[in-house]
């Protein structure tokens, strides 16, 4: 079995590197993109198991890609993140996380099994 892949698409470099450090210690392969274009390129190349997608990116609105991701990568777990204007939704297709993220929240996701642990080849 291979490591699970996580893609973080967020223009805040510090946040991206913190997320990478957090998940690498839990044995994930972590990819970071600071623009929507780079994120979509990595998404197509790596087909990650888990995606953390910010909304306000320098080259567009990340959440505008939600439908595309859900349709074309149905096995990827999508987590939308933002510090602004968090909509209330009842969909089970993705999770919405509000910045600043709490490490306890990520630990709970990991410990509860809501983040996949290993990739099945």
Ranges and model annotations:
Residues 54:
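Active-site residues of response regulator receiver
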Residues 81-82:
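Hydrophobic/aromatic residues positioned on beta-strands within the core alpha/beta folds
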Residues 41, 63-74:
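Short amphipathic alpha-helix used as the core "switch/output" element in two-component signaling
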Residues 35, 61-64:
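Acidic catalytic/metal-coordinating carboxylates
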């Amino acid at each position: 079995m291979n490591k699970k892949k996580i893609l973080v698409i967020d223009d805040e470099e510090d946040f991206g590197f913190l997320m990478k450090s957090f998940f690498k210690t839990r044995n994930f392969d972590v990819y970071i993109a600071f623009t929507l274009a780079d994120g979509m390129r990595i998404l197509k190349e790596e087909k990650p198991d888990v995606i953390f997608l910010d909304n306000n990116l320098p080259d567009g609105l990340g959440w505008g890609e939600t439908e595309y991701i859900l349709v074309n990568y149905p096995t990827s777990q999508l987590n939308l993140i933002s510090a602004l204007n968090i909509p209330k939704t009842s969909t089970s297709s993705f999770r919405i996380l509000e910045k600043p993220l709490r490490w306890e929240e990520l630990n709970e996701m990991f410990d509860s099994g809501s983040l996949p642990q290993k990739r099945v080849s």
